[in-house]
Amino acid sequence: GASPMVDGKVDLVGNEALKKSIETYKQLIDEKIMVDYTDWDQYIASMNKGTAAGVIQGCWIMSSIQAADDQAGKWSIVNMPKLDDVGGATNYANCGGASWAVSSNCKNTDLAYDFLKTTFGGSVELYDDLLPNAGAIASYLPAAESKVYNETSDFYAGQAVYKDIVDFAGKVPGIDY
């Protein structure tokens, strides 16, 4: 619910939600509840070796978690915790990958917009093909109704993870820039 931007300007001074987030992050590190890896290999190893109890990340991390067969059935996809004392805080956020844009340098913006609208922003069938073949998960909400998105995952103990992810995506609050 909160934003580091207000009216197109960075809003860091006096941003109570940001301050509370940083304080909570520091507390989690100081109390050794959370580990902040700066090395990608160590980060992934923490999930694959079972030393991480959880991870707050985008859905694209799933393939890294699934790289360790012995972790099957030990993971599930859930919404994230929220800061109780921050107005507008939710259990949902976006971690990249859900935006499409047309450059101002585009020679045919109408064609580009139409392409995005009818493919990534308008075709459940496209995502039904992309999900099993490329692992591309949609934030296009109607995709959650498809048969492919409702299939369960043995790795995630029978959870319909893709349906849940699209459902969560529909609850991510907008951010004002």
Language-model regions, residue ranges each:
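Periplasmic solute-binding protein
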Residues: 1-7, 22, 88-103, 163
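Beta->alpha turn/N-cap motifs
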Residues: 40, 57-62, 80, 96-98
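Alpha-to-beta junction loops
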Residues: 49-58, 73
